[in-house]
């Protein structure tokens, strides 16, 4: 699991933000096709720009 995390984190570029479903979940986020609900904030996207990763 740690090796998987290292591979995904190195490939995704955490300094550039979350850009896919896997890194969204690793960062304790969830994907939604609308604005982030309630007090949640957008931390990236999930494959398509219109699908937001919220945390």
From Swiss-Prot:
Chain positions found as Pyrrolidone carboxylic acid: 16
Tissue distribution of the protein: Neutrophilic granules.
Organism superkingdom: Eukaryota
TM segment ranges: none
GO biological process: cell chemotaxis; defense response to bacterium
Keyword Secreted among UniProt keywords: yes
Protein location: Secreted
SUPFAM superfamilies: Defensin-like (SSF57392)
Disulfide bonds listed in the record: 24-53, 31-46, 36-54
Pfam families to which the protein is assigned, alphabetical: Defensin_beta
GO function terms (MF aspect): CCR6 chemokine receptor binding; chemoattractant activity
Cellular component, GO annotation: extracellular space
Keywords: Antibiotic, Antimicrobial, Defensin, Disulfide bond, Pyrrolidone carboxylic acid, Secreted, Signal
Task performed by this protein: Has bactericidal activity. Active against E.coli ML35 and S.aureus 502A.
Family designation: Belongs to the beta-defensin family.
Name this polypeptide is given: Beta-defensin 9
Gene name tied to this protein: DEFB9
């Amino acid at each position: 699991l740690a090796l998987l995390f290292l591979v995904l984190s190195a490939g995704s570029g955490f300094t550039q933000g979350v850009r896919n479903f896997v890194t969204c979940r690793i960062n304790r986020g969830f994907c939604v096709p609308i604005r982030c609900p309630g007090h949640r904030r957008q931390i990236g996207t999930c494959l398509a720009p219109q699908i937001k990763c919220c945390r």
